[in-house]
Amino acid sequence: MAIIGERLKTLRLEKKPTQREIAEAVHITEVSYQRYEYGSVRPSLDTLIALADYFDVSLDYLVGRSDDPRRLP
């Protein structure tokens, strides 16, 4: 679970949105997003997909199954 939080934080810091902006974009609360980033709660599959879409990375990258963030066409 920690890998998801680490990846979320890295992506957020690279792209510069606030936690609130991300949460609003994927229709979750800011507190929920913070918990995902801190690794204290695991996001649902729907939320993981929304986050991967938001950051334009593959779901495999977000969950740690790949080190390549690119999405396959």
What residues fall within each predicted segment?
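DNA major-groove recognition helix of helix-turn-helix/homeodomain DNA-binding modules
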Residues: 27, 46-61
